[in-house]
Swiss-Prot record:
This is Probable tRNA sulfurtransferase. The gene is thiI. It comes from Clostridium perfringens (strain 13 / Type A). Keywords: ATP-binding, Cytoplasm, Nucleotide-binding, RNA-binding, Thiamine biosynthesis, Transferase, tRNA-binding. Gene3D superfamilies: 3.30.2130.30, HUPs (3.40.50.620). One of its GO terms (molecular function) is tRNA-uracil-4 sulfurtransferase activity. Belongs to the ThiI family. The keyword Chloroplast does not apply.
Amino acid sequence: MNNLILVKYASEIFLKGLNKNKFERKLKENIRKKLKDIDHEFITDQNRWFIKSEDLDGVIERVKKVFGVKELCLVTQVTGDFDSIKEEGLKKIKESKAKSFKVETNRANKKFPMNSMEVSRAVGGYILSELGDEIEVDIHNPECKLYVEIRGNAYVFTDKDKIKAVGGLPYGMNGSTMVMLSGGIDSPVAAYLMARRGVETHCVYYHSHPYTSERAKDKVKELAKIVGRYTEKITLYVVPFTEIQMDIIEKCREDELTIIMRRFMMRVACELSEKKKIQSITTGESIGQVASQTMEGLIVSNDASDRPVFRPLIAMDKEDIMDIARDIDTYETSILPYEDCCTIFVPKHPKTKPRVKDMIIAERKLDIEALVNKAIDEMETFIFE
């Protein structure tokens, strides 16, 4: 008998029709990359994926963070004869110390002489005969569910052997995006959610030295690293933004500062995406959360972009965003008290209902192309793997 890890991928992949094989191949490739320095064997048994390794804990810790993997199960592989299935089932139930149980069988191997219902009844009957009054069957609300998978071999496990994974779609299957990453709570969550949908994720951070410190930059680098744990690698572009901000402050109205700065961030992200062949922009904006994120503000920001702008948090409450941040381990880093370029030079009364035509007129005082190109020419690049 061997202990293996059963890999269950997101049910959405089953719905991909003729593209299903592409998604499966990409998911396998991503799993293997995650396990490149762990000795393991990838086993396929009648469309089920299993991983064999001496370091099962290490495999679980990494594979549960692979986008596209829905669930991992620590299973025991037994020979296909029925006695070994019954004995392993009995052992699992004893280990669970449950007072009630239920058996569920998936018989994919149609050559096996019993159907799924017959296997469940026979295994359950054997357990009852061995344990007597210690346990009972409860098909509605059992303390322990015993699962039997019959394929080329047979596999036995319980619901206590299941580990929830991140789900989503295989990373790298759905194009690419440039995430405008700040040091706050929202944008790392937006980056994670886009990556979870299979979108190759890159990040740009706007640094306002000397008004923002090196610790603020280090904080954003750490956030990129954390998001990068879920991806193959992640690239962070650090763009100097001070000159742009000072020019805007000097030449534009105070109540328009925030939205014009936001439009410049969009332009820089778009120009950088053009150079790096990245298809879209992603932000951590949520409708109505701050003054620049009114419907009118978002429309004016979008006007400065020549690419699709995705906002995965757009209709989420702050509490929901914070819950995800905690789940993915970005929250504690995000709340470190270092200011970013979005929190300095904030006007007392920012315009909440800006108009595109007004911003275009205001920006005529600025050399947009020169400012954007100079910022990109002076940027730093960090790659985290």
